[in-house]
Curated annotation (Swiss-Prot):
Name of this chain's protein: Ribonuclease HII
Cofactor(s) needed for function: Mn(2+); Mg(2+)
Single biological process term from Gene Ontology: mismatch repair
Residues annotated to bind a divalent metal cation: 78-79, 170
């Protein structure tokens, strides 16, 4: 007796690679429903295969470090929030498990909000260590955004409960006596930096949503501090708040105008 289409779909889910799917007896079944199920499973497996291949490519920096020193403790570091008009810059330092396989990791800007949340939850549950570092709007104004970002990153490293031996950093060098590799667009090239990017983004977005409750009218829950139309309109109506960066335009001009300078 032939299997039902539903049964075939269930059996196809037990096939976990394209080679096995190509060799499956179900390819000989000419029923339209079976062929559609095979095509659907093939698409899923191709997507999974692409994720694995991309992930393996993003482990290249980590693998090179470990090939030289198998005992290396690698820490990925990234930040979010350099460009907004309001809110802190948030950095995250992450030390992944040795057997990590967080497929789907990528630059946080390329990952959907839903997938970013899932990845963040998985990372928080399974990483060896992670910690955040924050530089406030006041510190950004007193220093500059570059130096404030360095401060946030160093605080994240200091807050770790594990001491790293090699830092992988997204386009930044830190004045620390620890081996480090600065990688341009590192959040798209290193799984460790991508993990830090995801966690930093989720952490800062959560903070900005909370700030939206404290300061309604600026649309922080959507713009997370960036200079969107709704945010700028909120500034015109309500004025600036302590979380605004006074060294960033147009906030700077508004402050000077009020001081009549």
């Amino acid at each position: 007796m032939a299997h039902s289409i539903k049964e075939v779909k269930a059996l196809l889910k037990e096939i976990h690679n394209l080679k096995a799917l190509d060799a499956s007896e179900w390819n000989k079944d000419e029923r339209k429903g079976v062929q559609q199920a095979i095509a659907s499973r093939r698409k899923q497996l191709e997507k999974e295969s692409a994720l694995v291949a991309h992930y393996e490519e993003m482990t290249r920096y980590e693998e090179n470090i470990l090939s030289d020193n198998p005992e290396a403790v690698i820490c990925g570091i990234d930040e979010v929030g350099r460009g907004p008009l309001a809110g802190p810059v948030v950095a995250c330092a992450v030390i992944l498990n040795a057997d990590h396989a967080y497929y789907g990791l990528d630059d946080s800007k390329k990952v959907s909000a839903a997938n970013r949340q899932k990845l963040s939850e998985a990372l928080i549950e399974k990483t060896t260590a992670y910690a955040y570092g924050i530089a406030t709007p006041e510190e950004i104004d007193d220093l500059n955004i570059y130096q404030a970002t360095q401060v946030a990153m160093m605080r994240a490293i200091e807050n770790l409960n594990v001491t790293p031996t090699h830092l992988l950093i997204d386009a930044m060098e830190l004045p620390l006596d620890i081996a480090q590799t600065s990688i341009i667009k590192g959040d798209a090239k290193s799984v460790s930096i991508a993990a830090a990017s995801i966690l930093a983004k989720e952490h800062r977005d959560t903070y900005m949503r909370q700030l939206a409750e404290q300061y309604p009218g600026y649309d922080f829950e959507h713009n997370v501090g960036y200079g969107t139309k709704a945010h700028l309109e909120g500034i015109k109506r309500l004025g600036i708040i302590p979380e605004h960066r006074k060294s960033f335009e147009p906030i700077k001009s508004i402050v000077l105008e009020k001081l009549d300078i």
